[in-house]
Amino acid sequence: MAAKSDGGGVGVGFAQLHNLDEAVGSGGEEDGEPGGGGCGGGGDGSEPGESSSMHICHCCNTSSCYWGCRSACLRSLLGRKPRRSAAADGGDQPLQPPAAPGAGRQPPTPSAARPEPPPPQVERPWLDCLWIVLALLVFFGDVGTDLWLALDYYRKGDYVYFGLTLFFVLVPSLLVQSLSFRWFVQDYTGGGLGAVEGLTSRGPPMMGAGYVHGAARGGPGVRVSPTPGAQRLCRLSVWIWQSVIHLLQMGQVWRYIRTMYLGIQSQRRKEHQRRFYWAMMYEYADVNMLRLLETFLESAPQLVLQLYIMLQKNSAETLPCVSSVTSLMSLAWVLASYHKLLRDSRDDKKSMSYRGAIIQVFWRLFTISSRVISFALFASIFQLYFGIFVVVHWCAMAFWIIHGGTDFCMSKWEEILFNMVVGIVYIFCWFNVKEGRTRYRMFAYYTIVLTENAALTFLWYFYRDPETTDSYAVPALCCVFISFVAGIAMMLLYYGVLHPTGPRAKILASSCCAELLWGIPLPPDVEPMAPEIPGYRGTQVTPTRAVTEQQEDLTADTCLPVFQVRPMGPPTPLGRPYLPEGPLIKIDMPRKRYPAWDAHFVDRRLRRTINILQYVTPTAVGIRYRDGPLLYELLQYESSL
């Protein structure tokens, strides 16, 4: 969700960075403007360190500025207005600060030698904003209807249902807010730059705290470092703000708003769009992980509970139905958003379109609704056996996931805990956790789910009370199986037509037709359209009859079909073929395989180190792991740190 560029500085959206060709720190000019100098101060005359304010807060001296603005926290506390740059005022340009060690400027590449960038993809920035706004609406609708329903149970005197409904709202929310605040503490307290020698919060490396902007050129001197009192006051205000936000259970809302702010800034401020993009991706990944955890701890149990209550009361009131629909929508939306962001975050995978994401929403809606209805029907009669069934299914799925081997976390015990959490997800729906062909695993999973749904539903049907359930027994059976079939149809539509790697239906159709028409595939070493070699015909001698008959028999045995397929060119790589030009930060550890997150998304120590490397190397344009393609090495990160 950062602004993409077609090489001419035209942003067409804030989706992932496929091919940015702006001259970031290259010393060249583009569209008449000097290339951004990053956080070390550049030719734009801005204050030193201002361009990196998303990562280095000027007053807090930290690499995680939670105010999301260019030191506005310090300016508001001290009553200072934003100062215009010297270049904008027509004054003298400040002295260029010395470059960071190992992060020198690269000479501009001649335009004739640079490859032509591909045409920009058609993306609309309002779609990205709308997607986040809809995610916020789904969140408020889910939590709001659950709280409203709990209050309604309390007014009616149903204290048991009130307690259960409120329990499935408050306990998951407290757990998720605690995890979110813990991440904030790790980022805010561990992201300081005091331990980095020669690095200050307002100037580039090796400048020191006494660097005065413009004083060396006779301009007005500006004090770089804020006072210690202002630093303490700003830190205290950040701590109070984040504490209040998380106590009000609004940590995810704040992260959604900050993600949208960073995405908009990445489209508006093209000279620093890479930094805004990285900061936005970190924030968006955090909020999606938190939402995924909360939905399966709160929305999924809440959905089963409300359906169970409606079956016990033998009535479907408006408020429980609305609460169930919003919980179901929250589950489907979070799963689709999670998988879309996961593909967007990896440069070795093509991003998912919004059409594909919407089809995924319907896929999850139908399959989860079929699963939950069968759960509620069975639990309305066999409460004890339903609990045993859920525990057994969770244990079996967790063992299956652990046995398959996943690579999501940084340690073995964290990986086992993650697999146990994914086992909870597998109670309700499919969740891909392993690279490779998923068709066989999905076929096995959905076969098991269909068998379980049918068994639970038919057991309820045969042991139900006909007097109270005849009015909805047959429609309930139809909903279970029709919803499951509709969900599988949506899944096939997604993988067959809207998958990011291309329509699978065309590939399967072409291979099947080739096998039906030819019987066997074309040998790879045969070139039927190859031209004759000059000079070879003149050296031939008239063959004898025996040799001619032998050659005719050989030709008849190896004859090729009349209609042949023209050889295709080299296949298009699955990832993004155009790598960004510029220095790269190398992480000396193997890259995790899809569908796992990259290590710098889940390891917060590594994320903080990358933030510091981005600060000391403002021209860095990408991150490469040890086993990935690398243009050239600039900085290395040892995995033992």
UniProtKB/Swiss-Prot annotation:
Location in or out of the cell: Cell membrane
Give the matching Pfam families.
XK-related
Family to which this protein belongs:
Belongs to the XK family.
InterPro entries linked: XK-rel, XK-related_scramblase
What protein is this chain from? Answer: XK-related protein 6
Q: Which PANTHER family match?
A: XK-RELATED PROTEIN, XK-RELATED PROTEIN 6
Q: Name one GO biological process term.
A: engulfment of apoptotic cell
Biological source species: Homo sapiens
**Chain positions covered by the region annotation Disordered:** 20-47, 84-120
Q: Where is the composition biased (Gly residues)?
A: 34-46
Q: Which UniProt keywords apply?
A: Cell membrane, Membrane, Transmembrane, Transmembrane helix
| Record field: compositional bias (Pro residues) | 107-120
Q: Which GO terms describe its cellular component?
A: plasma membrane
Q: Which cysteine residues pair off into disulfide bonds?
A: none
